[in-house]
Amino acid sequence: MLVKFVACFVFVAVASASDFSSFSYGVADPSTGDFKSQIESRLGDNVQGQYSLLESDGTQRTVDYAAGSEGFNAVVRKDPALIAAAPYITAPYGYAVPYAYTSPYGISNLANYRALKFASALPYSRVFF
């Protein structure tokens, strides 16, 4: 019985060690300036991949990473971006207000406003709990 259990355990370990999966995606939107990509592959318990994105300062950050039985390791690089920045769009002309603004309620008299007397609901003390 023990031999069957050990043999079954070995077959499961071999089957899980040969599992392979991978994925990748990318986004390139020049109107918003969103440029990023990622690729990752997994073989058994070992994962390795890379992702990159365009940062707000105009550089491209690239991270190469690997994870496995020896731990997680990442290498980060910052390179100048080869993608031109989105152009600044200006309005063709300024907007002129056709009339001066006046309040529909008239001018308020701020001299009538004053601070109201206020009493604390609980007396203040210097005792701290």
Curated annotation (Swiss-Prot):
<dbReference type="InterPro" id="IPR000618">
    <property type="entry name" value="Insect_cuticle"/>
</dbReference>
<keyword id="KW-0193">Cuticle</keyword>
<dbReference type="GO" id="GO:0042302">
    <property type="term" value="F:structural constituent of cuticle"/>
</dbReference>
<dbReference type="InterPro" id="IPR051217">
    <property type="entry name" value="Insect_Cuticle_Struc_Prot"/>
</dbReference>
<dbReference type="InterPro" id="IPR031311">
    <property type="entry name" value="CHIT_BIND_RR_consensus"/>
</dbReference>
<dbReference type="Pfam" id="PF00379">
    <property type="entry name" value="Chitin_bind_4"/>
</dbReference>
<protein>
    <recommendedName>
        <fullName>Larval/pupal rigid cuticle protein 66</fullName>
    </recommendedName>
</protein>
<feature type="domain" description="Chitin-binding type R&amp;R">
    <location>
        <begin position="18"/>
        <end position="90"/>
    </location>
</feature>
<feature type="signal peptide">
    <location>
        <begin position="1"/>
        <end position="17"/>
    </location>
</feature>
<dbReference type="GO" id="GO:0031012">
    <property type="term" value="C:extracellular matrix"/>
</dbReference>
<dbReference type="GO" id="GO:0005615">
    <property type="term" value="C:extracellular space"/>
</dbReference>
<comment type="function">
    <text>Component of the rigid cuticle of the larva and pupa of Hyalophora cecropia.</text>
</comment>
<keyword id="KW-0732">Signal</keyword>
